[in-house]
Amino acid sequence: MNLDQEKRVMLAFTLSIAVFILFRVFFLKEPPPEPKKASPAATAATNAPKAEAKPLGISAPAALPVLQGAKPEEIVVESKLYRIKFSTQGAVIKSWVLKKYLDASDQPLDTVNGPACESLGFPMSVDMPNATLKSQLNQGIYVPEALEPGKGGAAFNPVESKLAPPVSLTFTYSDGKIQAKKRFSFGADYTVKADVRVSEGQQYVPVTVTWPGGFGDHTLSPALIESARLAVYGSTDHLSTTAQSKVKEETTLPGPLQLAGMEDKYFAGIFLPDNPDQVAFRLARQEWSPPNWTEKEKPRPLIAGLVGMQPAPLDFRMVVAPKSLEVLKAVSPPLDSIVDFGWFSMIAKPLFIPLRYIYEHWIHNWGWAIVILTILINSAMLPLRLKSLKSAQEMQKVAPIIKGIQDKYKSVKLNDPRKQKMNEEIMKVYSEHGINPLGSCVPMLLQMPFLIGFYRMLDVAIELRHAHWILWVTDLSAPDRLVVAGVGIPVLVILMTVATFFMQKMTPMATVDPSQQRMMMMMPLFYAFLFYRLASGMVLYWLTSSLVQIVQQYFINRHMPPSAALPVQRKAAEAKG
């Protein structure tokens, strides 16, 4: 090779090196490290590093990596209180079982209506005006990631693990333009912390989280579901409810909302938004056609939605729990106001406090607790009962005189002014003998608030739901039936009717009028008709009360014999003639 050729070769080599270096400097950049896989089910379609969404504000990540799962998977989080089953398809809740409770068919109570949700969507589905985007986010396969603080803080694939609180579970979906992330944190109680965010490009978009298909015990009859299911919303100080039957069309209730959700007779599912001023509450009914149901029977479950009004993450807590005063009072803010004892809450709620004390400290049987509390109530009312019986005996003494006055005016019509004169004469007799005509009614009047209070307490307190007493009485919140040869016999109602009859037979009556006496003796049959469909705990209360009064009346009759009737005054006798 000559010198010129060598120079040309060296020049070419030098220029090649220079071009290579310049190309590297100006046209090539350092490739980023390969991102860590979120789970074996994830498939990353880009080498860009994963961008984490900002916790606050409306700005979303600048870059959105593609992050989608390969196939639907199920993930279960289970504690002593609940078992929640998630699906990675849509990052929704397919089942939320309250482990300590059974439904009407004696199966573990699932608050999610699975068959309805297969058609209508599952809890934690998102809703938004863009139908295509809504479908994409509810049908897409999310990538799950779990974090257990007590195990070193390393994220792992939850599909291959059994999760138990304390744990957090995050689902992420992205197609490169749209990203959705749902994060759930679980603790030892009934509260689940949730964070749902959807971003498009570099901006968050408003999102609504829904609970379709209704809530509660779905094994009840359609009539019971329709009457017992409510939407509840507002604040703990000012709570509003709307019956499911009253929801005719989609309604959005504006904030501020401290709480919003659904409830049935014994269970509640409540959203507690972190920012009450930035949410609304949406209610609607959904058409659902179960197999083998007629058009008339076709149910229309209630759907509830927590609406985010701002383009920002939607942060809230979910409380899916029994409507127990103790459980709901432990929530922050306390939710015990959800337990509605009705107009007689001032009696029903205080009645439950000693009843629960007796159950927890004396005897672990709700039926015997009712018996003991009833004995205590009747013992406390004994002085009033004695006073009432004394008043009844005094009225018996003057009964012939009263009868003479009534016979004197028996031909007078009701609208005749002389009827007023008759009443004045009767009241004069009572006054002369120091008798209060209403005195004998006091015990009955005092019993009525307790009766209604017990009714409301037994109808609302979840502690008495499926509570066993003895033998055939297995549910104090349900009517008493002993099934013999396929026929349900209301044994407690029969015993109550007999006891009430004997109690009235032993109690002196304040009247000698045969028609009124017959009417009073018919009262036990009226009570039987009234109590036939009531809870067995209610019948047990009245039966025990009647038995206690029989014992009391036995000793009263021995030590307080009835007084002899006064002779009819001559004036009354002459008037009769």
Which residues make up each language-model segment?
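Helix-loop-helix
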Residues: 1-42, 86, 195-197, 211-213, ...
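General structural signal for secondary-structure boundaries
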Residues: 4, 62, 66, 78, ...
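Aromatic/His-enriched, Gly/Pro-containing loop or helix-boundary segments
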Residues: 4-7, 44, 160-162, 174
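Juxtamembrane extramembrane loops of integral membrane proteins
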Residues: 25-116, 171, 175, 573-577
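Intrinsic low-complexity, intrinsically disordered segments enriched in polar/basic residues
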Residues: 27, 34-54, 60-64, 134, ...
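Soluble non-transmembrane domains of integral membrane proteins
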Residues: 74-337
